[in-house]
Amino acid sequence: TSGTGIINHTFKEYKPCVININRNRKNGALISMSQGKAIPYALFNLQERGKLIIPSNIEVYEGMIIGFNSRENDLTVNPLKTKQLTNFRSSGADEAIVLTPETKITLEKAIEMINEDELIEVTPKEIRLRKRYLKEHERKKDQRSKN
């Protein structure tokens, strides 16, 4: 613009949103059962269960959704599981693990994906999904009270 710019703006009115967002996805969630760093070895084995939404070596906590199950039910998983080393296996053999790229979650995608028992955490660096009740026994208790 070389220092000169013209901006036009047109506004008619505010209206309530009339679009009904269907928030119920058919697949369940993969939920972390413990707190710590997600290990690539564990995530490699969890890839078969569904789509992951977190990269490896990221901090996770109990109740955090780390992926979406390929089936309808929620599944509590351990993303911190490490490979058992024996005298025959060396720790350098971990380098052969290749993870599929995680699904990036935007705020819009997160709003579309959440179920009634889930929440969205928005921080300056990340957007995370989590269960309303972080402890597994609290989630089961809530599920029983609904039925």
Regions found by a protein language model. Give the residues of each.
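Accessory interaction regions appended to the cores of large information-processing enzymes
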Residues: 1-147
